[in-house]
């Protein structure tokens, strides 16, 4: 493919990425965090791409956050060496962690139980290596972690230090923020996140245990935090791309969404009000993250080739390789005439879930011309 080729020439379905929107989204959050005096440790789990990583990291070596050891291995090969593996560690993963640290990667891990801590201590003793650990704190009862006032936080910290691991600090993630909407609710979630992490850090220090890192973050809370006192870093990832869920929460506008799926119209069922496209769940994913929001976007919002949304036109059903596009229930909008062979773009509900269906980004400039292809990787 030649540079500056029209997206009309692409084989569909294809994953499109507006590099100008990516730059704008990164600059927005970086400016906000600079104003709060806290650095960003970007999450690369959505990107899974070295070119995107280089755009969002402050240095070529990091820092960054990942969600799989495959990401650690791929980014380390590209020169990224300051990485937080932000999924609770399983004992079976520790040999790979040790191998990566032996190769020079400053890889830290997270845990929230004595069993995990014992496995880490055993690995440290057997390998004569200190593995850096952050204790995961639960800020909102939505996922993993210990409550900040749980005495296990201190017990785990002591076990790690006495057993030869490195207690690097605490971390938390406000999973509940994805169920909030509006500035006030998201600010409240951000403050709960900060308070939980800082309280746990204070408890560790009061027990004469080290806690240099206090790590918080999600894309919604990162944008609406007003005070990050006591926090040493913020983690966020989908802000680079944004999606319909983030738009529904009020974190971004639809015009900020940098990722879309290009699809071809392959049929009509006019009596049913259906347009058929060649992007099914293997391209869009089956994420229904907007289902409980004020506006349900189905499986994604349909746009014309320029990226302008069709009024109330959404993906309403998915099969493996077919998508059905129709007007949302109750709409009074006029059903558009989109002939077979036409190209449309779908804005995804969940950028992370959609991106993982593809092995490359078709990178667009400000004129929506394809100027590059950036490879993605997958796996665990």
Question: Which residues does each predicted region cover?
Answer:
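C-terminal accessory subdomain/extension
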Residues: 270, 275-380
């Amino acid at each position: 493919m030649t540079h500056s080729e029209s997206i009309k020439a692409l084989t569909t379905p294809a994953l499109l990425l507006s590099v100008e929107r990516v730059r704008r989204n990164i600059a927005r959050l970086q400016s906000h965090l600079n104003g709060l005096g806290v650095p960003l440790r970007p999450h690369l789990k959505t990107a899974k791409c070295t070119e995107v990583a280089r755009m969002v990291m402050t240095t070529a070596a990091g820092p960054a956050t990942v969600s799989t050891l495959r990401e650690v291995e791929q980014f380390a090969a590209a020169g990224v060496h300051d990485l937080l593996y932000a999924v609770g560690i399983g004992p079976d993963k520790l040999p790979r962690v040790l191998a990566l640290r032996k190769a020079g990667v400053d890889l830290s891990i997270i845990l929230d139980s004595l069993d995990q801590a014992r496995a880490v201590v055993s690995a440290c003793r057997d390998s004569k290596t200190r593995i850096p650990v952050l204790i995961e704190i639960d800020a909102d009862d939505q996922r993993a972690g210990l409550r900040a006032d749980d005495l296990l936080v201190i017990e785990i910290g002591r076990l790690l230090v006495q057993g030869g691991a490195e207690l690097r600090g605490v971390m938390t993630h406000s999973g509940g923020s994805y169920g909030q909407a509006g500035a006030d609710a998201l600010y409240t979630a951000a403050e709960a996140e900060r308070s939980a992490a800082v309280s746990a850090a204070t408890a560790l220090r009061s027990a004469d245990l080290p806690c240099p890192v206090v790590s918080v973050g999600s894309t919604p809370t990162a944008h609406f935090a007003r005070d990050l006192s006591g926090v040493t870093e913020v983690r966020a990832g989908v802000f680079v791309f944004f999606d319909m869920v983030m738009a529904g929460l009020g974190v971004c506008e639809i015009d900020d969404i940098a990722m879309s799926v290009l699809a071809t119209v392959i049929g009509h069922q006019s009596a049913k009000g259906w347009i058929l496209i060649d992007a099914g769940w293997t391209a869009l994913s089956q994420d229904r993250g907007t289902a409980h929001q004020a506006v349900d976007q189905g499986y994604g919002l349909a746009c014309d080739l320029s990226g302008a949304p069709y009024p109330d036109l959404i993906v309403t059903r998915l099969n493996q390789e077919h998508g059905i596009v129709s007007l949302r229930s109750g709409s009074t909008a006029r059903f558009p005439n989109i002939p077979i062979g036409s190209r449309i773009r779908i804005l995804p509900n969940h950028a992370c879930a959609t991106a993982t269906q593809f092995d490359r980004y078709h990178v667009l400039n400000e004129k929506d011309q394809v100027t590059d292809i950036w490879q993605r990787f997958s796996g665990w």
